[in-house]
C-alpha cells in the first residue's frame, strides 16, 4: 500500500495495524466511524515484522523507564535529608515525565503501553489481540528487569541498602489499603489513557493527537504524589516485578501480589467504565 513503511508490509496480516495511542479514526470529512474490534487471537501477527518491532519498542521503553526512575529513587534514598534531594515531588516528576517522553516516542510503533495494566485494559476493550497483549507484557517485564539490573550494576551497595526501588506496603497501612491504592491509582491512569486516545475525540478538528502523552504522563505524576507514601506507587506490574527480582529480599515479595492484582483490577474497571458507561458501545445500534 502506498505511503506505508516497507517493513510494515513484510508478512503483514489481513488486519490493519492498531496503535491505540496517538492514532485517529476519521474520514476525509472528519466524520466519526467506530473502529472495528481487534481479533481475539491473530496468529498471522507472528509473521509480521511490525509485530516484533513493537515488542522491541516496549522492551526498550520499559528498560529506560526503570533505569531513570529507579535511579531517581536511589538518589532520594541516599540523601541525608529531603532538602538535599528532589524529594517525593522529584520522584513523581521522574515517573510522569518518563511516561510522557516514552509514550511520545513509541506511540506510533507499539502504541506506547509500557505497562502490563495498560495493555490488559486495552485488550479488554478489544484494542489489540491476545497474541499482541501477551507479547507486550512479556517484553515489558523483561525490559523492567534489565533496567533495574543496570541500576544495581552501577551502584550495587546503595541499591541493596536503599531498597532497590521495590514496592512494599508502608508501615502503618494494611494490605487492604495498599490494594485499594493500587486499584484506584491504576484506574486513574488507564481511564486517562482511554480518554486521551479515544477514536471519537481524535476525529474532531480541534483534537491534536500528538498531545495524548501529556495527560497520560500527568496522570502518572499525580498518582505518584498521592500513593508514594502508601505503596511507593506501583500501578505498573512490570515496574514492580523488575525491582523486586533484582532487589530480591523477602519483604519485597511479601506483598508483591498486590502490585499485580491491584493494577489489573483497576485496569479492568477503567476499561469497563469507559466502554460501557462513557462510550456505551454495547448499546449502540449496528448500522
From Swiss-Prot:
The keyword Phosphoprotein applies. The keyword Nucleotidyltransferase does not apply. The modification N-acetylmethionine is found at residue 1. GO terms for cellular component: cytosol; plasma membrane; plasmodesma. Residues 1-34 are annotated as: Disordered. It is a multi-pass membrane protein. The modification Phosphoserine is found at residue 285. PROSITE patterns: MIP. Keywords: Acetylation, Cell membrane, Membrane, Phosphoprotein, Repeat, Transmembrane, Transmembrane helix, Transport. It comes from the Eukaryota. Predominantly expressed in green siliques. Also expressed above ground, in roots and flower buds. Residues 77-92, 155-175, 231-257 are extracellular. A motif (NPA 1) lies at residues 115-117. Disulfide bonds: none annotated. Aquaporins contain two tandem repeats each containing three membrane-spanning domains and a pore-forming loop with the signature motif Asn-Pro-Ala (NPA). Aquaporins facilitate the transport of water and small neutral solutes across cell membranes. Belongs to the MIP/aquaporin (TC 1.A.8) family. PIP (TC 1.A.8.11) subfamily. This is Probable aquaporin PIP1-5. The lineage of its organism: Eukaryota, Viridiplantae, Streptophyta, Embryophyta, Tracheophyta.
